[in-house]
Curated annotation (Swiss-Prot):
Primary location: membrane
Keywords, alphabetical: ATP synthesis, Cell inner membrane, Cell membrane, CF(0), Hydrogen ion transport, Ion transport, Membrane, Transmembrane, Transmembrane helix, Transport
Name of the protein: ATP synthase subunit b
Subunit structure: F-type ATPases have 2 components, F(1) - the catalytic core - and F(0) - the membrane proton channel. F(1) has five subunits: alpha(3), beta(3), gamma(1), delta(1), epsilon(1). F(0) has three main subunits: a(1), b(2) and c(10-14). The alpha and beta chains form an alternating ring which encloses part of the gamma chain. F(1) is attached to F(0) by a central stalk formed by the gamma and epsilon chains, while a peripheral stalk is formed by the delta and b chains.
Coiled coil: none
Molecular function terms, GO-annotated: proton-transporting ATP synthase activity, rotational mechanism; proton-transporting ATPase activity, rotational mechanism
Keyword check for Ion transport: yes
Record field: transmembrane: 7-27
């Protein structure tokens, strides 16, 4: 009988232990486990939200970079266009100036040629008169001399 009383005593002690654990030990353990589960769920949700925000931020940053590149390309294209316009304008002005200088040079050469030609005609006429005076042996009067020179210049 002793064996049965020990067994019943152990059963009562075990039942008291289980009741004590269910009353005082299990609730804090369950509460701690549930809090831990909630913290893990919140952390996972926060991580997922942060991951989504990071993806959105990256997409927005990529979009801004693309806009900046497009704007930079527009500025470069505009600057290139403006540079080409300025070059064409300067080249056109230089061509006009070159033509003006060439025409001015031609005009100066032509006027110098006419002046030299006139000077040469007068010298030839003077030489012709001097030669005629030597041949004739006398001097022709100045009025007749001028008439002869004018006719000779006109013929040359």
């Amino acid at each position: 009988m002793n064996l049965n009383a020990t067994l019943i005593g152990q059963l009562i002690a075990f039942a008291l232990f289980v009741a004590f654990c269910m009353k005082f030990v299990w609730p804090p353990l369950i509460k701690a486990i549930e809090e831990r589960q909630a913290n893990i769920a919140n952390a996972l949700a926060s991580a997922e939200k942060a991951k989504q925000e990071q993806a959105d931020s990256k997409a927005a940053a990529d979009q801004e970079i693309l806009k900046a590149k497009e704007e930079a390309q527009k500025i470069i294209d505009l600057a290139t266009k403006r540079r080409n316009e300025i070059l064409e304008s300067v080249q056109a002005e230089a061509e006009i100036e070159r033509q003006r200088i060439i025409e001015q040079g031609h005009a100066e050469v032509e006027s110098e040629r006419k002046r030299v030609q006139e000077e040469l005609r007068q010298k030839v006429a003077a030489l012709a008169v001097a030669g005629a005076e030597k041949i004739v042996g006398r001097s022709v009067d100045q009025a007749a001399n001028n008439d002869i020179i004018d006719k000779l210049v006109a013929e040359l």
